[in-house]
């Protein structure tokens, strides 16, 4: 409800009159009461709401993904005319969007599945918007979407037509998967700085403030520096009293499931999903900590050197995560005939969304130099960073393993990097085993 309200207020602030409807009369009345003088027109029946709109109607749905979206669409259909446009701005599974697009197209309606990133504040002030559906329908809503979207530093709106049917929601799903990876990498950096150097919260905030001035400059690093020094009403550091169980809404899982369907090695992001799952086993972990032995973390010898190694490992890990994510976008584009523009996608992530970061421009640059590049690690800038930073990543992972600090995404990053650069892998033995017990046959070199 908050996302819908904030998007309505965002649209209204651009000079539009906005019809609003919620199943709950009270919620509709509440929005109107809280926003006196705004050009928000309340409606209390679906019929009245639909009939208030000029044709072709442009209806933005912000409902919980799943059955709720289908029932909302079903309630609208009796009152729609051919050519009307429904925009689904929820966190919808892309296969559902493909299905709804097909069904609504058959009835003569347009359906635009749209990823919206930036949270409640982004919805109000300017989100990153990822629309997919009929191109001609997108053209009819593009002026509004461009006005309400976030603006990058160069003034460009963070919205672009992504592709047919489920393309927009797919890109939003991968965005969320990358977000999982970014957050877990940062959490592991935090664990290393606490475990290896016993940094205080103030020192952590100072370190992250410095990191945010350079290559790692991003929304997530920026908010993390603030989180470290936030105190509760008792004067305790808030982060230190928050239970170490990370919840999830399932979008990271969807990204990993899709990687398995496509045969894409999305190892880092998938490890970040698993890390949340193992965090939720709190009671088991507490019990296991009293039974299972392991090394006690020994302090790192050189403080400044260790901090720099962790910074480099974090940046290279981030690059590997995005390389995997964009490789999966390419596989999905081929599978679903979307013709995705990867440089354009990186561009619309530059502002408004949770993964906004300075280095996204480097991704756009890489695709502008070579649109057909198979993997971002092969682009000159990212190859150079890998050359320079891989030793730090290796050292940090080795330190973590020796000292019993779990770093699943850092470990996944170096394993993927080494696998990807290996001309020969031991998979020949696996294939021989498969042929031995199942006559699966094999190819000769």
Curated annotation (Swiss-Prot):
Reactions listed under catalytic activity: 6-phospho-D-gluconate + NADP(+) = D-ribulose 5-phosphate + CO2 + NADPH
Annotated pathway: Carbohydrate degradation; pentose phosphate pathway; D-ribulose 5-phosphate from D-glucose 6-phosphate (oxidative stage): step 3/3
SUPFAM superfamilies: 6-phosphogluconate dehydrogenase C-terminal domain-like, NAD(P)-binding Rossmann-fold domains
Signal sequence segment: none
Positions annotated to bind substrate: 91, 117-119, 175-176, 180, 249, 276, 434, 440
Active-site positions on this chain: 172 (proton acceptor), 179 (proton donor)
Keywords: Gluconate utilization, NADP, Oxidoreductase, Pentose shunt
Superkingdom, natural source: Bacteria
The protein's Enzyme Commission number: 1.1.1.44
Enzyme class of the recorded protein, top EC level: oxidoreductase
InterPro entries per the UniProt record, alphabetical: 6-PGluconate_DH-like_C_sf (IPR008927), 6PGD_dom2 (IPR013328), 6PGDH_C (IPR006114), 6PGDH_Gnd/GntZ (IPR006113), 6PGDH_NADP-bd (IPR006115), 6PGdom_BS (IPR006184), NAD(P)-bd_dom_sf (IPR036291), Pgluconate_DH (IPR006183)
SMART domains documented for this protein: 6PGD
GO biological process: D-gluconate metabolic process; organic acid catabolic process; pentose-phosphate shunt
Molecular function as annotated in GO: NADP binding; phosphogluconate dehydrogenase (decarboxylating) activity
Residues that coordinate or bind NADP(+): 1-4, 22-24, 63-65, 91
UniProt subunit comment: Homodimer.
Role this protein plays: Catalyzes the oxidative decarboxylation of 6-phosphogluconate to ribulose 5-phosphate and CO(2), with concomitant reduction of NADP to NADPH.
Protein name: 6-phosphogluconate dehydrogenase, decarboxylating
Native source species: Raoultella terrigena
Gene: gnd
């Amino acid at each position: 409800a908050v996302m819908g309200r904030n998007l309505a207020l965002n649209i209204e602030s651009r000079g539009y009159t906005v019809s609003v409807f919620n199943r709950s009369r009270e919620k509709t009345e509440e929005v109107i009461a809280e926003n006196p003088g705004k050009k928000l027109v309340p409606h209390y029946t679906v019929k009245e709401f639909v009939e208030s709109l000029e044709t072709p109607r442009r209806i933005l749905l912000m409902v919980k993904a799943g059955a709720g979206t289908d029932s909302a669409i079903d309630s609208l259909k009796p009152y729609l005319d051919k050519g009307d446009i429904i925009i689904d701005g929820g966190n919808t599974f892309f296969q559902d969007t493909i299905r709804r697009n097909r069904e609504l197209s058959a009835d003569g309606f347009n359906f635009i599945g749209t990823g919206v990133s930036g949270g409640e504040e982004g919805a109000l002030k300017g989100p990153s918007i990822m629309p997919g559906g009929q191109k001609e329908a997108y053209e009819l809503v593009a002026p509004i979407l461009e006005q309400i979207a976030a603006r990058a530093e160069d003034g460009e709106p963070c919205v672009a037509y992504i592709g047919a049917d489920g393309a927009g929601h797919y890109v939003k799903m991968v965005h969320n998967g990358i977000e999982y990876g970014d957050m877990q990498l940062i959490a592991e950096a935090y664990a290393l700085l606490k475990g290896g150097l016993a940094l205080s919260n103030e020192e952590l905030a100072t370190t992250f403030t410095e990191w945010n001035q350079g290559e790692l400059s991003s929304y997530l690093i920026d908010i993390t520096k603030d989180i470290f020094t936030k105190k509760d009403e008792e004067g305790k550091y808030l982060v230190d009293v928050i239970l170490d169980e990370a919840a999830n809404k399932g979008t990271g899982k969807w990204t990993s499931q899709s990687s398995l369907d496509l045969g894409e090695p999305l190892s880092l992001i998938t490890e970040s999903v698993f890390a949340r799952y193992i965090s939720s086993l709190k009671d088991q972990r507490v019990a296991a900590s009293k039974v299972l032995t392991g090394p006690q973390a020994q302090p790192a010898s050189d403080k400044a050197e260790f901090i720099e190694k962790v910074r480099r490992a974090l940046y290279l890990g981030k690059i590997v995560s995005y390389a995997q994510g964009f490789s999966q976008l390419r596989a999905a584009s081929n599978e679903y005939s979307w013709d995705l523009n990867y440089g354009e996608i990186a561009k619309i992530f530059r502002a408004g969304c949770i993964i906004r970061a300075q280095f996204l421009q480097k991704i756009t640059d890489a695709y502008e130099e070579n649109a057909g590049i198979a993997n971002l690690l092969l682009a000159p800038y990212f190859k150079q960073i890998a050359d320079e930073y891989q030793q730090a990543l290796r050292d940090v992972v080795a330190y973590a393993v020796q000292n019993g600090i779990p770093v699943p995404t850092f470990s996944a990053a170096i394993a993927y990097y080494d696998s990807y650069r290996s001309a020969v892998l031991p998979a020949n033995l696996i294939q021989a085993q498969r042929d031995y017990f199942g006559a699966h046959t094999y190819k000769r070199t």
